[in-house]
């Protein structure tokens, strides 16, 4: 059975994944699927670095603005949504291009993980109930002991990741469902960090503070509020930090997030990384995609 070919672009935040995805979509008749756990939420545009209206006009985007901020979203939800999007895109003769930085979501899709099938649901439920009795600290210690590093740490995601780790054989299909070309973008650490600092400054100038304040005042405890880009500004609203201090924390946490992203993809997935500073970029990637699409 022939597997559908898809392009997957990964890399740390602020490295230029969105721009490359749009360029490849234009060059190879593609449509973009967001692989970011936060971009599913409506009204959260700036802090999630969502493709702008102008960028979305250049290429069709899927899995953006599909949930209200009050709703939860998981790797399981993403896999179901992404599969439907891929099927839709392919049915119209176009190329699916996944762009994102949420490692667990992409791994779940590409390696065929699922919560169901042959897995004994009673066994899964028993393990889940056992995890629910643990404190947050105990959960995170268990994650660390198993070498699991999450893009964003919260209780729900910690439990889901431990389930995935515990039942890996039962949760993994016999065969990966797609034929992906993995494209990783990177650069020197100092360059990425400088790009992050500049992006945060631009976000603040574009209205991030107002977006974060709305989330803080309306929905401070929802899953969406725990994403990097929002919670770092909450201490400012609470009078516990100056705006300068909160902004500095946001930059620092985003830099740490970028480092974790790179570590995840290098350790968990077979990705060839290209430096965006190389003279061959992006032509070398265009050539690789062209060869990939011509392969039987």
Swiss-Prot record:
Catalyzes the transfer of a dimethylallyl group onto the adenine at position 37 in tRNAs that read codons beginning with uridine, leading to the formation of N6-(dimethylallyl)adenosine (i(6)A). GO terms for biological process: tRNA modification. The lineage of its organism: Bacteria, Bacillati, Bacillota, Bacilli, Lactobacillales. Transmembrane segments: none annotated. Substrate binds at residues 13-18. GO terms for molecular function: ATP binding; tRNA dimethylallyltransferase activity. Residues 36-39 are annotated as: Interaction with substrate tRNA. InterPro entries: Dimethylallyltransferase, IPT, P-loop_NTPase. This is tRNA dimethylallyltransferase. Its cofactor is Mg(2+). PANTHER family: TRNA DIMETHYLALLYLTRANSFERASE. The keyword Magnesium applies. Monomer.
């Amino acid at each position: 059975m022939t597997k559908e070919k898809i392009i997957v672009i990964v890399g740390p935040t602020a490295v230029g994944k969105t721009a490359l995805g749009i360029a490849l979509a234009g060059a190879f008749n593609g449509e973009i699927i967001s692989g970011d756990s936060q971009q599913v939420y409506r009204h959260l545009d700036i802090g999630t670095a969502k493709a702008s209206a102008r960028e979305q006009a250049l290429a069709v985007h899927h899995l953006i603005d599909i949930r209200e901020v009050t709703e939860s979203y998981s790797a399981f939800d993403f896999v179901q949504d992404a599969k439907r999007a891929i099927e839709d895109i392919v049915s119209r003769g176009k190329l699916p291009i996944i762009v994102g930085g949420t490692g667990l979501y992409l791994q779940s899709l590409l390696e065929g993980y699922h919560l169901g099938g042959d897995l004994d649901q009673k066994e899964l439920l028993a393990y889940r109930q056992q995890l629910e009795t643990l404190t947050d600290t105990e959960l995170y210690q268990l994650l660390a002991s198993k070498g699991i590093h999450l893009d964003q740490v919260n209780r729900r995601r910690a439990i889901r990741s431990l389930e995935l780790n515990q039942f890996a054989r039962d949760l993994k299909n016999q065969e990966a469902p797609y034929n992906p070309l993995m494209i990783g973008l990177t650069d020197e650490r100092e360059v990425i960090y400088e790009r992050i600092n500049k992006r945060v400054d631009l976000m603040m100038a574009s209205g991030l503070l107002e977006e974060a304040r709305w989330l803080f005042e309306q929905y401070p405890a929802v899953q969406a509020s725990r994403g990097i880009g929002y919670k770092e500004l909450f201490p400012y609203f609470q009078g516990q930090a100056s705006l300068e201090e909160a902004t500095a924390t946001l930059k620092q946490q985003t830099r740490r997030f970028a480092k974790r992203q790179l570590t995840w993809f290098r350790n968990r997935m077979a990705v060839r990384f290209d430096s965006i500073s190389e003279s061959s970029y992006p032509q070398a990637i265009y050539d690789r995609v062209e060869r990939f699409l011509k392969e039987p």
